[in-house]
Amino acid sequence: MGSTRRAGRTGRTGRTGRGTIAVTACAAALAALTAGPAGAHEPEHRAPHWELKDTGTPDVRYRGLAAVGRNTAWAAGTAGTVLRTTDGGATWRNVSPPGAGELQFRDVEAFDARRAVVLAIGEGEASRVYRTDDGGATWTESFRNTEPKAFYDCLAFFDHRHGLALSDPVDGKFRILSTGDGGRTWRVLPDRGMPPAQDGEAGFAASGQCLVTSGPKDVWLATGGAADARVLHSADRGHTWKATTMPLPAGDPARGVFALAFRDRAHGLAVGGDFRPEQPSPRAAARTSDGGRTWRPATAPPTAYRSGVAWLPHSRTAALAVGPTGTDLTTDAGRTWRTVDTGSYDTVDCAPDHGCWAAGEQGRVARLEH
């Protein structure tokens, strides 16, 4: 669903690493954001912070983001724009698909500096998928939607070959697109194992994170716009699904779960709320430790709507959530959140080498420095 329906729906690849320690160096550094000033005899260190990178695209809003590493990232946004950096954001190359200027890219999944898949959203033929194998020098359109009722929101990959894309309901059920060759070809999965959608229920294409994976087969999708906000889970790559009602705001087209992040197949985070600037968003975050069967609301949630969320690499406890009014940090696996930055971002993504990136309106792309 865009607007943050037609302009704001949400997917992500299961790129977060598993760690054996509670908080790694990156996460520990982030925890410093919640600490007091250094002692009189301690050297002063600047706390971890977002450092904006000049993309040269002030008119573009980036809701699609793929962090390959600290040096390499892809961003996808309005006006058919796709950017890529391989030098930590010092320079950006415009690698937009030719003839895509009227499209809105809302998700990008990148396997490395050369291979990436981007999703354009919209009704009917506006929903498309493109793939590149040469860093964006050339693109192949691998899918163009022909179902007038479909509206694709986000995509996610299990590995370099297997992936899914999510559409709003068609004939009463969410539609799932599947690829087994890295996004070169796609097919619609049968909907026999998909529970019926609620009236008005849809995904939010707000950050590329309404569809996320962990491991070889587990995938979750997030919904809103209906009486209940829900998360649906599949353990067989999208063939069968089970739905769980969420403790996040619902009951309005502007409310629901906007983004998910799983650090493994059991532990996940959900963020969302009401995307309208004038509306409060209580209960804007929740967490699960059983793969999404049950969810508990955060005891101290973000103070406003959040559209993106990402675990810190190799951490069991630290994660970031972003939205138009700022960035929040949790260091206790989603129980409590604290605002640590007030800049506007729509999406956030982290790579295993501790490279974390955020992107949003007015061409804003930033890397976490620490």
Show which residues each predicted segment covers.
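Composition-driven detection of intrinsically disordered, low-complexity segments
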Residues: 7-10, 59-61
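Residue-level hotspots at or immediately adjacent to binding/recognition sites across diverse folds
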Residues: 41-370
